[in-house]
Amino acid sequence: MFKITRKHNLTDHVFRMDIEAPAIADRAQPGHYVDVRVNPDHSALTLPVVDCDRNLGTVSVVHRAQDLPSVQLSMLVEGDEVFEVRGPLGAPCTFPDVGKVILAAEDLGVASLFCRARTYRERGAYTICILGFENKSEVFWEDVFGAVSDELYVCTRDGSYGVKGGIATPMRAVCETYGDVERVVVMASLAQMRKAAKIAAEYDIPVVVSFDAIRPPIGSPSIFDVPDWSQEAFEFAKAPEIDAGDVDFDKLLAKEKAFFRISEDAANA
């Protein structure tokens, strides 16, 4: 059993939890994830490790209450225990030496972006962070990112807070302002990642993307497996970041649309 040592509501439906797991905390790096099982009778939640404290022996995860396993996890409080935490799983991120980097994320991807931003800042990079949300009520960790960013932009799709629009809007402005950005990291919706990749290409900036922000619910078929790539089918758990040039966004957007259409038809059956 693994004890929850801290729980913090980031929004009405998004929660951060610190879980006591010393063996995992000792080895976890940005890009790793864990499988969290609330009890032995239900599916595990696959969650990115957003932070860890080796002194306290805790790993931090952020999740949204949206399906049965995640709702069950959200109902637990400090002092409660989960049945199982497995990890660290997956592969860690790479951090090339760069002078200036743009890191952009939407929604839950913001949580995964934090440890990446902190690592780049610790390595001496000028760190520009762009955080995107649906509306003001969904905004979280603006203060946390303020501590690891040289520049910070917050945007909402409905314009209720910060810059109106998706993350691509402030990203273009930043690219126009600076001619020395050496890397872009994006974890957002497929549409926003495609826009970001096109903008970065216009300025000849290498860009990597992550699917952390749009991982499907547990038990759903992954829409991100692309068997006809020249490499193994992508799964977010196996490759935390991938070169945007290797992603066929048009194909993935078509698969995403088909996936949600099938899901909607099944729900209405």
Set out the residue ranges of the language-model regions.
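Ferredoxin-reductase
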Residues: M1-E78
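Structural signal for conserved beta-strand scaffold positions within catalytic alpha/beta enzyme cores
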Residues: R6, D51, V154-T156, V209, ...
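Surface-exposed loop/turn and secondary-structure junction residues enriched for glycine/proline
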Residues: K7, H13, M17, R27, ...
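Short, charged beta-turn/beta-strand-edge "cap" motif at the junction between a beta-strand
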Residues: N39-S43, R86-P92, E241-A244
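FNR/FR-type flavoprotein reductase catalytic core
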Residues: L68-G219
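Iron-sulfur (Fe-S) cluster-binding segments and ferredoxin-like electron-carrier domains
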Residues: A196-K198, E202, I223-D265
